[in-house]
């Protein structure tokens, strides 16, 4: 399969089950909502070292938020249910509670699985906090020096998918970055999906473990590192001098597949040789995003089957 | 099965009747004959509902009452579901102790509307009498949940001893929120004297100005973040008349009643 002269490899991205929450931050204006969201999602690129993966999902107009103010929707994922409330509580506590003018709401109101988030955070109020029931939901008014911080008592929990990905193999670093930026721009604001890495782009795709250093959880993906082409078992076709990766987490398979389709299509620009994806041979992750199926418009979860082709490891 | 049950008053009432048999959930499973046989009470004497009302429809979730019903007491008492539509004015204790469902009164209501209710909604297009959302006689708590929306005025002691829930109205008589334990009284216009006397943790929101009792003390002027959420909900759900200026405006916060634990508040909107 080719798109505008760019080969789409017959392979798949292998992804894992995660647990996620959607956090709605509102503020006096978009600036302060963004400020808080940027802090909340800071240092949240990979569960490997950050304990969670988080990013801005999209901006919300006042008509879309519970309190009629400008807002930002954030998705945050962890590998297990137990750590999800811990990460959400510590991040909201340090980055939303502290931020001028913000309030914080659940973005998954239909989820039957509820996490106590505002409930523990209310104790910052040292007994001066007060609750209000509004439309069947409890909210906590926590007195702070600025005035009051408002937070919903419980947040919904969702089963998510983490580690959707594709790799852009380009003739130069400039082209790879242009293509990756175009891909990120095309996926920006898509519902149910985040790109947790800086600017949505990863330059240091990794493999599991290491060849030289025992105990490493991950190390450089040497098969896709152009400087190592002649001294390792390379996966790079001729003419490829730079590779960038896009990693996606989402609330469901279809959201990721939909975003991947848009992103891959946008990345097919002159100077890009091929698009491939990272997997572990299909043995570890239950979610397989087959690039050619996705680009053919098949966006639903398919029966698992390992594909042939080079196996990059995200 | 019908889409609604309609009860039409056969003749004007010359004396008060207790009509707590009339509630949407209690009528929902009954045939027209069974509905007509339900008792209304004239003091200690039972009167068949069918002698007072003509009944049309059966086994429906919506009940419509028609006629001059101002002498009918306790309609919708302990109602837990369904819809009760009252086309006219209604007597005292409408929706008292109701648990759920919706009651809409197209006219005005007498005293004790929604007293001790714990859920559902009671919307009164006209005025309501004294003690709306308050406590039953001798009880320690008024309403403990649900919403009372009065588009006109409420009488004295609205929301007295309320524990939870929201009462909102265009204007309120003296003693609104008397002895509130918690919950919300929201008044779009004028409020009578001594609002929130004995208030423990309740919120009285005055969108049209208020004479603050001496047992309250000014704390600050700020934008209460929960109010925009609450007022938006009331506007969306009940078409309560709230301007955008109210949603995000400044409010003076008075803490009180300081003769009590002082965790209650009066929030007075500041026109800019």
Task: Pin down the residues of each PLM region.
Chain A
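Conserved mixed alpha/beta catalytic, RNA-binding, or beta-rich assembly cores of soluble enzyme
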Residues: 2-10, 14, 19-57, 61, ...
């Amino acid at each position: 399969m080719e798109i505008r002269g760019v080969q789409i490899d017959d392979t798949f991205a292998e992804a894992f089950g995660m647990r996620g929450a959607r956090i709605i931050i509102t503020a006096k204006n978009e600036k302060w909502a963004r400020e808080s969201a940027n802090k909340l999602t800071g240092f949240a690129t990979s569960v490997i070292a950050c304990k969670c993966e988080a990013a801005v999902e999209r901006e919300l107009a006042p008509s879309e938020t519970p309190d009629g103010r400008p807002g930002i929707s954030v998705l945050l994922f962890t590998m297990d249910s137990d750590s999800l409330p811990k990460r959400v509580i510590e991040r909201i506590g340090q980055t939303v509670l502290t931020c001028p003018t913000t309030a914080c709401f659940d973005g998954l109101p239909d989820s039957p699985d509820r996490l106590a988030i505002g409930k523990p955070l209310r104790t910052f109020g040292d007994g001066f906090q007060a609750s209000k029931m509004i439309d069947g939901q409890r909210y906590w008014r926590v007195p702070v020096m600025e005035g009051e911080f408002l937070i919903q008592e419980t947040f919904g929990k969702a089963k998510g998918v983490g580690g959707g990905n594709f790799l852009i193999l380009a003739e130069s670093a400039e082209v790879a970055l242009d293509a990756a930026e175009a891909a990120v721009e095309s996926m920006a604001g898509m519902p149910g999906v985040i790109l947790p890495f800086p600017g949505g782009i990863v330059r240091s795709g990794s493999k599991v473990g290491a060849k030289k250093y025992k105990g490493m959880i991950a190390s450089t993906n040497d098969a896709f590192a152009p400087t190592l082409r002649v001294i390792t078992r390379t996966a790079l076709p001729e003419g490829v001098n730079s590779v960038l990766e896009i990693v996606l987490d989402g609330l469901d398979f279809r959201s990721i597949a939909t975003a991947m389709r848009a992103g891959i299509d946008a990345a097919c620009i002159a100077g890009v040789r091929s698009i491939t994806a990272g997997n572990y041979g299909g043995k570890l992750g239950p979610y397989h995003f087959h690039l050619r199926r996705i680009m053919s418009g098949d966006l639903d979860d398919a029966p698992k089957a390992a594909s042939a082709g080079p196996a990059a490891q995200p | 099965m019908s889409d609604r049950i309609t009860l039409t008053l056969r003749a004007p009432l010359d004396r008060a009747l207790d009509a707590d048999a009339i509630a949407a959930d209690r009528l929902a499973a009954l045939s027209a004959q069974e509905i007509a046989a339900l008792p209304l009470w004239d003091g200690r004497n039972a009167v068949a509902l069918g002698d007072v009302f003509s009944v049309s429809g059966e086994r429906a979730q919506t009940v419509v009452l028609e006629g001059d019903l101002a002498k009918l007491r306790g309609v919708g008492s302990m109602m837990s579901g369904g819809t009760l539509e009252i086309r006219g004015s209604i007597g005292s204790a409408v929706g008292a102790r109701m648990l759920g469902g919706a009651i809409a009164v197209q006219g005005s209501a007498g005293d004790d509307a929604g007293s001790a209710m714990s859920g559902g909604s009671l919307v009164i297009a006209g005025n309501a009498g004294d003690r709306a959302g308050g406590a039953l006689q001798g009880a320690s708590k008024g309403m403990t949940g649900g919403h009372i929306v009065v588009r006109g005025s409420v009488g004295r002691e609205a929301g007295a001893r309320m524990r939870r829930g929201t009462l909102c109205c265009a204007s309120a008589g003296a003693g609104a929120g008397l002895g509130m334990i918690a919950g919300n009284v929201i008044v779009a216009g004028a409020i009578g004297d001594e609002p929130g006397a004995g208030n423990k943790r309740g919120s009285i929101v005055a969108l049209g100005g208020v004479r603050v009792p001496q047992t309250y003390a000014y704390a600050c002027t700020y934008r209460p973040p929960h109010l925009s959420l609450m007022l938006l909900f009331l506007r969306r759900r009940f078409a309560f008349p709230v301007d955008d200026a109210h949603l995000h405006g400044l409010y003076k916060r008075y803490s009180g009643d300081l003769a009590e634990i002082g965790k209650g508040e009066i929030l007075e909107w500041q026109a800019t």
